[in-house]
UniProtKB/Swiss-Prot annotation:
InterPro entries: RNaseH-like_sf, RNaseH_sf, X-over_junc_endoDNase_Mg_BS, X-over_junc_endoDNase_RuvC
Domain of life: Bacteria
Annotated residues for binding of Mg(2+) 1: D7, D141
Protein's gene: ruvC
UniProt name for this protein: Crossover junction endodeoxyribonuclease RuvC
HAMAP family per UniProt: RuvC
CDD domains in the cross-refs: RuvC
Any GO BP annotation: DNA recombination
Length: 189
């Protein structure tokens, strides 16, 4: 499974591409950080982020895009910019029929380090180790994008099994409800 990991941001947006193999084998294919000037207007900054993400999607052809879910930050303006960057990337993926999955920072940290409260240094160290890199990816946005892609490679099979189980349970409930309705009808009839 080829996964594009995205650590969204306006000033720095981490992009990564990994290939998931058998078991927990993951290989890094590419990683970069898109930078936009803080003094540029918002629409053009978003366009630069979207253009880079679209180029990556068209070049690498991922099977899924994993984006960090933004749910709270101390600075509302930063949170808005981060969410907007993630949104334009999700839109670019949707236009290409590429599934988009959002993972929380704690899910990513737990998947990569085993600790949902790990710090950036721990995440970077584990990403370096998991991917067998000679040097740690820098800046942190690059490491975070790789961590997101790794997280999705490892969580995707579990998420698929859970979705299948939920669908099976919904179908069983539907059949049960139909049988119950038929029995009630027979008793009344």
């Amino acid at each position: 499974m080829r996964v594009m990991g995205v650590d969204p941001g306006l000033t720095r947006c981490g992009l990564s591409m990994v290939e998931g193999g058998h078991g927990r084998t993951v290989t890094a294919l590419d990683v970069d950080v898109v930078r936009t000037p803080a003094d540029m207007d918002l629409a053009h900054r978003l366009m630069l982020v979207a253009d880079a993400a679209e180029y990556w999607m068209d070049t690498h052809r991922p099977g899924a895009v994993a984006i960090e879910r933004v749910f709270a930050q101390h600075n509302v303006r930063t949170a808005m910019g981060t969410a907007q960057a993630g949104g334009v990337i999700a839109l670019a993926a949707a236009r290409r029929d590429i599934p988009v999955v959002f993972h929380t920072p704690s899910e990513v940290k737990a998947a990569v380090t085993g600790n949902g409260n790990a710090d950036k240094a721990q995440v970077t160290a584990m990403v370096t180790r998991i991917l067998g890199l000679q040097t740690a990816p820098k800046p942190a946005d690059a490491a975070d994008a790789l961590a997101l892609a790794i997280c999705h490679c490892w969580r995707a099979p579990l998420l698929a099994r859970m979705a299948a189980a939920e669908a099976k349970a919904a179908e069983a409930k539907r059949r049960y409800t139909e049988r119950l309705a038929e029995q009630r009808k027979a008793v009344r009839g």
